[in-house]
Amino acid sequence: MFTALEKVVDTLRLRIFCFSACCNEVNASKKKGKKMSANEIKNQLHVMHDPFSDKTSQPKIPDGKANESLGFATQTVQEVGNAEGANTMHILLFPGQNSGILIDETAQADLGSRTYYIPTFFGSNGLDWDDLADATTAANVRGLDNYALWRVVSTGLQLKLLNPVDQDDGWWESVRVTTENTNVDWYLTTGNNSTQPGGNNGTIAPVGLINSLLSQQTLANEQSYSTGLLRDLHRVQFECHGQRDYHDFIQQRNEIRLAGAAISAVDKTTNYEAQFSLGHDDANDVINQFVDRSYDMVYIRLHCRQNTGTTPFLGSRFHLNCVSNQEVIFDHEERESRFHTRSHTIGSNANSVHMQARRADQNAAKMTM
C-alpha cells in the first residue's frame, strides 16, 4: 500500500518537474524572442539615423504600419569628375526608387546635349516609358519592380576626393532643399546615359529642379548651409531627412496611364527625356509612384580644379557612394512575398520622436569623423 502511494507521489513529482521545465523553456524562449525583437528594433533605428549603417540586413521603419515586409539596401558606387571646361560640379541627392543621385556638369554626361548624369542603383529594374511617343498622345508608364507598397527608410551620399595631395585644392558647399517641388521640377529620363527609355532603363529625376538651383548664385544665407574643403569631404556625409513625424507607404501600380496633356515635351532622339506639365494630376501621380516626396533633398556644389582636357589640368575626381535603404511589400501572389520578414514596432509616438530627432540637425552635411 505504502509502496503504491510512493509510486503515485513519484509520478506526480515527475510530471510537476516536467511541467515546470517546460514552462521555464517557454518563458526563456519568450524572453529570447523579446530580446531579439528589441535588438532588431535598435538596429533598424540605427539605419534610420545613419544610411550607411550595417547593423541590419533588413532596414525598416518600426512604426507598425506593416506586419510583414522586406527591407534591403541598394546603392551605386563609381568614380565621377567635373567636365572639361566646367570648374563647378553640381549634385542633387533625392529619395528616388531606382535612382537617388543627379550630377550636373560631369565628365560622365556623354548623351546628346545633356550636362547631367544619373547613375541608377545596382540591380534596380527601373521603369519603362517607351510607350510615350509625343506630347499630345496618351501613353502608359510601367514600373518593373512589382512592388505593392514601398517607402524609403534612409538615403545618403558619401564623397571622397581621389586626386593626389598636390592636386587636392577646391572646396564645396551644400544646402537642404525643403521647398515644395512641382511637376516641372521632374523629368522622365534614362539612367546611366542609356538611349533606351524602354526595358528597365527609365527613371524619374529632378532635372528641372537642379537647373533652377544652378542659377542660384549664393547659398550661404540658407539655414542648412554647410561648407568645407574638397580634401576633407571624406569627413562628412549627406543624408535626406523626412519632413513629417509619420511615414506612410506608397502604393505602387505596375502601369500608369498618362494623358497627352500630362507631358509638355518629349525627346527620344537626342537627350531621351520627357518633361511633365505643371499641375496635371497624371504627371503628379507618376512622380509620386517613384519618388518618396515625404523626404527633403540635398544640393551639393563642388568647386573643382580646372579641367582643360590636358595634363596636369584634368579637374577633380571623386569616389561616389550613394545608398538607399528601402522597405517594400509584395502582393501575396508574387513569389518574392515569401521573403517577407516580421516587422517590429516601437509605436507611432516613439517613432515620431525619432523622426523629429532626424530633423533636429538641419545642417546639409553631417560630420562622421
UniProtKB/Swiss-Prot annotation:
GO CC terms: host cell nucleus; virion component
Cellular compartments annotated: Host nucleus; Virion
Source taxon at top rank: Viruses
Keywords carried by this UniProt record: Host nucleus, Virion
Function: Self-assembles to form the virion icosahedral capsid.
Protein's UniProt name: Capsid protein
Provenance organism: Avon-Heathcote Estuary associated kieseladnavirus
